[in-house]
Amino acid sequence: VFSEEQLTRKQPGEKGIIMVQLENEYIYFDMESEKKEEFLRVLSDACIRNGIDVPLFTCVTPEVRGSHDPVISQLFDMDNQYVWWNMHEAKSRIEKLKAEQPNAPAFVCELQGGWFSTVGGRLSEDSYLDGRHARGMALMAMAGGSTGLNYYMFFGGTHFAGWGARRMTTTYDYGAPLKENGGVGEKYAAVKGIGEVVDKFGGLLVRSRPVRFDVQGADNLTIGIRRAADGTLFVFLLNRDKKQ
């Protein structure tokens, strides 16, 4: 259905599909690792047989990381950053991902900045998450060495009637920077600012290396320092003190 839309089938300068996801969050499936690995091999084979030749990836599936299986080792795993975590965990999770698969891209598949609306429950617009949260999550992922960020969601949408998951409303605004109705606010400004930094320094950032350092008297700070090949230093700070 989409094999001809892959970037590998396009002319230089044309847009196309750059990667294909095999599954979603197998870490939460109550299934033995051997069964997960078997299913991953089947999915991978199905893609290859149907002409998919762009990179194949998984989403939070530990079985892929560091695998020596001849099929699974050709995949790479991505991480998710969930909204209910402390923001500084985004840094340590990316560091863990890079350690477990050092020769693969360090991507965040879902850099979440909101949550869905539920019938009889909280709506996306009632979420406590604001521009500071969106900025902090992105910066901490970058501090950990992330080489790719995918906002989930960047823009809100609307389900066709009855097409949503169980207990979900028709609206899928998700508290996104670009809202379901097209509106923007401080979260959009925060994400736009991150995009401007990446646009200007992305080439240096993705090839930067972590810098070891020692900090005293800053218990409420999460700090990350990265050095680019030309000596440029990128310093990331997150104040975890709720009162300041």
What are the roles of these predicted feature ranges?
Residues 1-9, 13-22, 28, 33-53, ...:
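Carbohydrate-binding surfaces of carbohydrate-active enzymes
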Residues 24, 60, 80-82, 237-240:
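Structural motif
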